[in-house]
Each structure stands twice: as structure tokens, then as C-alpha cells.
């Protein structure tokens, strides 16, 4: 949606059509997440995930202020609960400093107690530029603005084939009634989320050889009893693991509290939360949120991340690639856009515009 809004502004007079197989925007990864505005702490400074996040953070706050998109700059605490995590936290701090993250600082256990009296950490890392956003209202803004400039939102429309032609691409689509038709376009932007590898494959790219294969990774959330509302005022994270940032205290704009997400690789797309995970969530979260009791947690929601690597494989960056060198001029692939995809939506849109 951010790409459509950007191009509707910079390429006025060109016909832009958004093809979406669901009956509205944001039915998958874009809405099923923690809705966090990240600051760019974790990853190496030369990665797209870092550079786009560092630039995207202030841009997104500015858009929210200007356009009235609900958000809150809560700040974020990453907590170390043992000595080994303290060493790991030092590494995150040093990386964040290299990345140029504004206001980042190490905090002591006493400072943690002052900032978040119901949380526990031997020490921590405080990021004042992290926050939360209403992702639905953000996407609604993108939709409304793009449509006001003439963009067509073709909901209930699934891409079933994509073929290079002399002048661009022939895109075969199917609607909810099963009717099929073909569109011709000079440019195709593949931002299909969990299905981006399938679109790339349709275009003739060997997704396994080129590293475009997506491995769905499920993240589940458990809600916290309303009796604890107000006990957490910031995003509170554990020191992260190797494949994700860790199940953390997720705040909503109305101050409801959730714990999540975990990270479970799956073969099928299902958004059902496994109730048997309650004890694991509880045992992990209670290390840094000691006020929790097992009965405080209830299954809430789940999302699926489009990861580019399997469990145990090396970390992979976003793929944002114009495919002219493969003989596919005018095709831009956005593959593996997981966290911090929400924070980087504006800078990803800028990058796509630049590539075109």
C-alpha cells in the first residue's frame, strides 16, 4: 500500500492497479504483527533492514503526526535477566551505536525499576525512538490517498500467471467468481508477502537457486489479563534469540497487553493459536515480567513471517531487486519483507520508485 501511495504521487498520469487476492488490504502479514515502530538496533549497518529502518523511523513518525495516524512513541527496554544476556546486550548496544540509533543507552537494574517498576532486569538497553502504531489506519491512509489520485484497488483478484512480453508483462488474474482475464503492464511490482516467491517463480526465476524461497514462520500471541492493565508503559523485550527478537510485552494504543510472538516454522498457513503454548509463554515472559501468573494468559492472535531462511540457517536481508539483469526489465521483487517491514514501508516505497 505504501508503494502504491508513493507511485501515485511521483508518477501521476500513469495507470496504477493494486492486485490483492483478499477482499481488502492487510489481511495477512501487514496486520498480524506487533505494530512496532523500530529504531534499527539489531542488524549490521550495511543491511537494507538497518538502513531503511534508520531512515524510515523518523519518516513514519512525521507522517503519523501530519496525517493523524494513531501512534505513540513509547520507547523500548531490552532486558538482560542473567550474566550471559548482559554480555549479549552489550553487543546489541555497540551495534546500535554503529548504526547511529538516536538516544540509545544502557541502563542499570535501578533505572529499569524506575522506568518500569513491574519489570525485572539486571541491566537493560533503552531505545527512546521505538514506538507503536495503528497499522490498519496507516494502510487506510495509503489506500485513500492512492485512490484519490486515481489508483485502482482491485480486491478479490488473484494473480495466477505472469509472462514477459515485448512491451512489459501479461498478468493473468482470477476474481472471486472464478472469472479469468489478462492485463498488460509495463511494470510489475511483486509485493505479495507470503506468496512473493510464487510470483517470482511465475516470472521465470528459479527461487531455490536464487535464494527467493520463502519459509513461513508463525508467531503466536497470548493476551494478558486486564487486571494488569497499566503495569507496562513501554515496549519490554527480552534479550533476543538467533531467529527472532523474542516474545515481548506488546502494547496496544488502548493499553491492552499481549505477550508474543514466538517463532515456529510451519508448512501450512493457519492463524490458530496453539493453547498448549501457554506454559512456555508464561515461563519465558515471567523472567522479565514477574507479576504474571499462568492464568493471566489467554490465546489471542497469530501472524506468519515470510522468512528467507530455515531454522538454523544464516540470517538473510530483505530482497528488493529490479530484475533487468535477468532479462526481466520492469519487474521489481520485494521478497522476505518481515520485521522491520512496517517501519520501513515508506523507505521501501522510495527504493522501489528509485529502481524504476
Language-model features: where?
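Helical element adjacent to the flavin cofactor pocket in flavoenzyme catalytic cores
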Residues: 125-187, 198, 346
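Short beta-strand to alpha-helix junction loop
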Residues: 44-55, 79-88, 126-144, 154, ...
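Active-site substrate-recognition segment that forms the wall
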Residues: 5-6, 37, 69-71, 182-187, ...
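Gly/Ala-rich phosphate-binding loop of Rossmann-like dinucleotide-binding domains
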Residues: 4, 8, 145
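C-terminal lid/capping helical subdomain adjacent to the catalytic/cofactor pocket in oxidative enzymes
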Residues: 9, 23, 315-356
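Glycine-rich FAD pyrophosphate-binding loop
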Residues: 8-32
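Glycine-rich phosphate/pyrophosphate-binding beta-alpha loops
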Residues: 42, 130-132, 240-244, 332-344
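Dinucleotide-binding Rossmann-like beta1-alpha1 core, especially the glycine-rich loop
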Residues: 35-111, 121, 246-247
